[in-house]
């Protein structure tokens, strides 16, 4: 074996092999599951690079069987770069653009098997009866089935029989090894920096060692070895050939966050019998176990909302392993379903967070957790651990950072010791430090002169601060807030069970070209800070909790998953006697309001808004009717201050619109 091919997470956490345009050493990679190459490239440029992600794991790029299911990508037909993700030219373009953004590409690589059955692949190649463009029947093991009982006691069958009927390559064969190595070397020549070896447990570790001897350079390699204990093939066998997926991490973290006590986690990692940190790739969930297979257990997924946030915050804050963030799509209970038919970057619209792509890597608690890990990599130890013996914990990373999680229904109030310098810090889970370090877009945490923090963390919430998120309080911020009451009315005929939400702010392209705001990197730059005035409607009030911005991205962290943006309330100017007892906004949160002088079916957003974020007093918005018409179409409003396909409203005014109509009435209070 070639020792120079061993890459460890210790090296990764020190920044080896990982270029970055971010301000700190990248320490975390993300799996953009089933994203096409154009979307990956755009995400590298607009978000992953600026946010400090180290790399992207992409779906297998080689030719595969046809079909819409996600697992068709895991049935190879050839090693031609023609897949559902795109063609060779598009793949090369993605690698180059991501590299320029400081983000490496890791390829999911299928070394154990080829496709089952017969047919035609995505590049037009035919296959069948173990005959493929690059392999013949003699390149495969004899057909036999892996039984469930084999995993505990029959190494031979696990590594020589067929995984779910897939043609099992003879990976001890020199020809097979040379063919796979040629594919890997081709990808490296393009610029790929790492490889996930799928189903590595089904390939003898000695075969992988021989394969790696034929691979050029020193790519990052991490091997999928599902080992929950009691296996005929153990994960420890693969430590000499690269990094290894630590599935016990995902299972035990899920068990603890769901049913246990976070206080147990003070020695999480090797102290729990896991492999050495320097060898482990860790994750809260992955594309297999979030669907209930592939090492599944009591796994936490995006469907768990805030619990998922908190589990990822812990993973990213705790110094163990090389973490992988999962970026999923909503499969609506169909575990075979492929990705959404709409691209992530859809003609200027980001199809994230709702019922299509979930984009967990953009959730502020997860992106903030990555920022925390990047900026605490120089202190690879836990300091000042504190817990309440149950589900409130806090710990530090020396003088580099400190964090706390409250997974209880009551507020966490405690004074904890840190090793950090005194001052005010931005809670990077909830906001971002301004470029001049004079303000934070979210919560500010104070470290006292003695290094303590007086924690006051709400139920099911968290905080994380680091040395590079410290506010410069020597002078006041140059931009003063200008909070003014602002009301939006949008008329739309709706039915029972339908509700209207509004998204808005400043158009990203306009802000970048004319205002110098990079809103692709930071949505806060184009969002309008708001405070809801009407919290009396029992239906919409829960949707307004933790809705602090009128923005383009919908659900904010801590906001109800039922929300589709900023919730509005149904209003009218009169209440006929035939409707029963009169309902009013003042008493009930919906119904009659003196602000509505037009008629029924006017949905109202009543907020205080920071007008200092508007463009000469103007901002944009668009409505969405849940369980109804969906989004409005393009708007062409007369006398708009600049060209836009959205409604244009004035901050500090009453603005009246019609759904899917370009007209507007604006009046003062």
From Swiss-Prot:
Record-listed substrate binding positions: 71-75, 113, 196, 201-202, 231, 288, 293
Gene Ontology CC terms, in alphabetical order: extracellular region
Signal sequence bounds: 1-24
Positions annotated to bind chloride: 196, 286, 324
Prodomain positions: 478-669
Subcellular location, principal: secreted
Activity regulation information from UniProt: Requires chloride ions for optimal activity.
Pfam families: Alpha-amylase, Alpha-amylase_C
Keyword terms: Calcium, Carbohydrate metabolism, Chloride, Disulfide bond, Glycosidase, Hydrolase, Metal-binding, Secreted, Signal
GO molecular function: alpha-amylase activity; metal ion binding
Cofactor: binding details: Binds 1 Ca(2+) ion per subunit.
Cofactor: Ca(2+); chloride
Subcellular location field: Secreted
Reaction(s) catalysed by this chain's protein: Endohydrolysis of (1->4)-alpha-D-glucosidic linkages in polysaccharides containing three or more (1->4)-alpha-linked D-glucose units
Gene3D superfamilies, per the entry: Glycosidases, Golgi alpha-mannosidase II
Disulfide bridge partners, by residue number: 44-98, 144-161, 352-359, 426-440
EC primary class: hydrolase
UniProt feature coiled coil, ranges: none
List of residues binding Ca(2+): 112, 159, 168, 202
Residues with site note (Transition state stabilizer): 288
Temperature dependence: Thermolabile.
Assembly behavior: Monomer.
PANTHER family (UniProt xref): ALPHA-AMYLASE
Protein name per its UniProtKB record: Alpha-amylase
Annotated source species: Pseudoalteromonas haloplanktis
The encoding gene: amy
């Amino acid at each position: 074996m070639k020792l120079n091919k061993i890459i460890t997470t210790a090296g990764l956490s020190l920044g080896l092999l990982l270029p970055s345009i971010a301000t700190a050493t990248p320490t975390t990679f993300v799996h953009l599951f089933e994203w096409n190459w154009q979307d990956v490239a755009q995400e590298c440029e607009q978000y992953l690079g600026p946010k400090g992600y180290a790399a992207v794991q992409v779906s297998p790029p080689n030719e595969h069987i046809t079909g819409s299911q996600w697992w068709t990508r895991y049935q190879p037909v050839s090693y031609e770069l023609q897949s559902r993700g795109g063609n060779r030219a598009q793949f090369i373009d993605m690698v180059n653009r991501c590299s320029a953004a400081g983000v490496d590409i890791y390829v999911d690589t299928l070394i154990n098997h080829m496709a089952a059955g017969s047919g035609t692949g995505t590049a037009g190649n035919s296959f069948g009866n173990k005959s493929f463009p690059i392999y013949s029947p003699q390149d495969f093991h004899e057909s036999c089935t892996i039984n469930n009982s084999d995993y505990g006691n029959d190494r031979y069958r696990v590594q020589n029989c067929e995984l779910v009927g897939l043609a099992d390559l003879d990976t001890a064969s020199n020809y097979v090894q040379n063919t796979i190595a040629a594919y890997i070397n081709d990808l490296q020549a393009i610029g790929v920096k790492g490889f996930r070896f799928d189903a590595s447990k089904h390939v003898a570790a000695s075969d992988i060692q021989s394969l790696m001897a034929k691979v050029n350079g020193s790519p990052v390699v991490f091997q999928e070895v599902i080992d929950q204990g009691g296996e005929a093939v153990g994960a420890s066998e693969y430590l000499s050939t690269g990094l290894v997926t630590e599935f016990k991490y995902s299972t035990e973290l899920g068990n603890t966050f769901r049913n246990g006590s976070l206080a147990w986690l003070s020695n999480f990692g090797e102290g729990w019998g896991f492999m050495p940190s320097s060898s482990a790739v860790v994750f809260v969930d992955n594309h297999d176990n979030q669907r209930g297979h592939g090492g599944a257990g009591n796994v936490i997924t995006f469907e768990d909302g805030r619990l998922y946030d908190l589990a990822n915050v812990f993973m990213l804050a705790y110094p163990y392993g090389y973490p992988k963030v999962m970026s999923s799509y909503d499969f609506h209970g169909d575990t075979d379903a492929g990705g959404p038919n709409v691209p992530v970057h859809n003609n200027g619209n980001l199809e994230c967070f709702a019922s299509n792509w979930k984009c967990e890597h953009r959730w502020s608690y997860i992106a903030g957790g990555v920022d925390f890990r990047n900026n605490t990599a120089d202190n690879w130890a836990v300091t000042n651990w504190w817990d309440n013996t149950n589900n409130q914990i806090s710990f530090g990373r020396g003088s580099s950072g400190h964090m706390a999680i409250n997974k209880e229904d009551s507020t966490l109030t405690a004074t904890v010791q840190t090793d950090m310098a005194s001052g005010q810090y931005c809670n990077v889970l909830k906001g971002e430090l301004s470029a001049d370090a004079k303000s934070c877009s979210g919560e500010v945490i104070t470290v006292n002169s003695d290094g303590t923090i007086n924690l006051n963390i709400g139920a099911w919430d968290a905080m994380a601060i680091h040395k590079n998120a410290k506010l410069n309080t020597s002078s006041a911020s140059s931009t003063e807030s200008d909070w003014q009451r602002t009301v939006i009315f949008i008329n739309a005929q709706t039915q029972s069970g339908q509700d209207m939400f509004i998204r808005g702010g400043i158009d990203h392209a306009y802000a970048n070209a004319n205002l110098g705001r990079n809103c692709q990197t930071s949505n806060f730059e184009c969002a309008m800070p708001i405070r809801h005035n009407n919290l009396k409607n029992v239906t919409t009030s829960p949707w307004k909790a933790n809705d602090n911005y009128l923005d383009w991205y919908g659900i904010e962290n801590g906001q109800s998953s039922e929300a589709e943006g900023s919730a509005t309330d149904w209003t009218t100017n009169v209440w006929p006697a035939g409707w029963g007892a009169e309902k009013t906004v003042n008493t009930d949160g919906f119904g009659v309001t003196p602000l509505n002088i037009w008629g029924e079916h006017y949905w109202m957003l009543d907020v205080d808004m920071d007008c200092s974020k508007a463009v000469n007093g103007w901002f944009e918005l668009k409505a969405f009717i849940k369980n109804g018409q969906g989004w409005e179409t393009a708007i062409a409003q007369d006398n708009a201050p600049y060209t836009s396909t959205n409604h244009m409203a004035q901050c500090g005014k009453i603005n009246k619109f019609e759904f899917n109509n370009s007209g507007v009435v604006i009046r003062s209070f």
